[in-house]
Amino acid sequence: MGAPKHETGGRPGRAVVWSWCLYDWANSAFTTLVVTFIYSAYFTAAFAEDPGRGTALWSRGIMVSALAIAALAPIAGALADRGGRRRYLILCSLLCVAATAALTFVRPDQPNAVVIALSVFVVANVAFELGLVFYNAFLASLAPPERIGRISGYGWGLGYFGGLGALAVALVVFVPETPLFGIPTGEGFNLRATNLLVAGWFLLFSIPAFLYLRDESGTGRGVDVGQAFRDLAATVRHLRRYRQVVRFLVARLLYNDGLVTIFAFGGIYAVGTFGFSFAELVTFGIVLNVGAGLGALAFGFVDDRIGGKATIGLSVAALSVATLVGALAPTRTWFWVSAILVGIFIGPNQSASRSLMARFVPAKHESEFFGFFAFSGKVTSFLGPALLGVLSDVYSQRIGVGSLLVFFVLGGLILWRVDEREGIAAAGRA
């Protein structure tokens, strides 16, 4: 296939932009089915003697993944800026697809099943997250700063709806007591086979991105790991040039911890405090994802109008209110109010965070800076769950959920000091 057409001014055409957005649709099957809903629940129930032990084991897999991503993402980004990020995007995507498919064939009754399953999952999860480093790095080249917000929003919105689409297929075809197409249910094979759905979905819908995305001229300087480390060290030494990036990443480190914890424990809180049934829990998940998808799509245009910083600030304020309402909610009705607020503003928060980072990254260093972006999202991601867990155990789930306000408030205060115009100018994107 020839090079994709570009619009006036050298910007990629619509086919390139939409192929980039479609990758969000593709990869969301992994986070929705494997990490959040189906395989994680299957693992905790089938690979341990009780759900509590299973949850502890699964959390270790998540923690190991997060530490590996935090360690690898910055250097992987620097390496990709030298060698061309497209090849690394394809490599990480295919590795995630292969490892996810392999999870299907790890049975809970085989020797060392827990170690094997968690090891394969960690490989898949790390490959997935590193792929996002290279994927996100393309955003800065897709549009000028004043249009980046809506494109990031398109991607996040499609991602949420893609995850829902894959979940719907899984619930109809694989999960019923009598799955369609004669899929066997022995030893939970039908549940493990949802990993094949994820692998196929991810691979199929990633193909346009693999075909249309191209590295900018000046990349492809050759794979030199030693030079990549030196480039990374030089960037760290000169971070004073990019002080707005540093402030933003510290702010994101905090408010993202609150966000991640809401996603991880929202369902647990709904069941433990408000007695949600499985059907109500599925409805809760759908509401969050639909709200997040619509919010990301709508607020992409708001982002381009008022700026990424203001959009993030608005979302952090709304999430703070939602957290407080959820912690104090006297009835299910008030809990649903908080859930809808969370759903509407989670998507814009994630989308605007990505678009603001894209405005702040200097040319030829996109992957490296998005490596730092991934680092800030993972290096302290255990703090929110740890604080909520301890306070829930000592006091109550309501106190635990309420404690997440600390992350949103501190993150919002640091974000308030970020100068968006200065950050864009320092990156040479004004």
Language model: regions and residue ranges:
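Helix-to-loop junctions at the C-terminal end of transmembrane segments
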Residues: 71-84, 294-308, 392
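Structural signature of the two symmetry-related core transmembrane helices
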Residues: 87-102, 310-325
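Short amphipathic helix-loop junctions that connect adjacent transmembrane helices
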Residues: 32-55, 264-281
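Helix-loop junctions at membrane interfaces in 12-TM secondary transporters
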Residues: 104-119, 327-339
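Multi-pass alpha-helical transporter architecture, strongest
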Residues: 104, 201-212, 403-430
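Intracellular juxtamembrane helix-capping segments at the cytosolic ends
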Residues: 130-143, 348-361
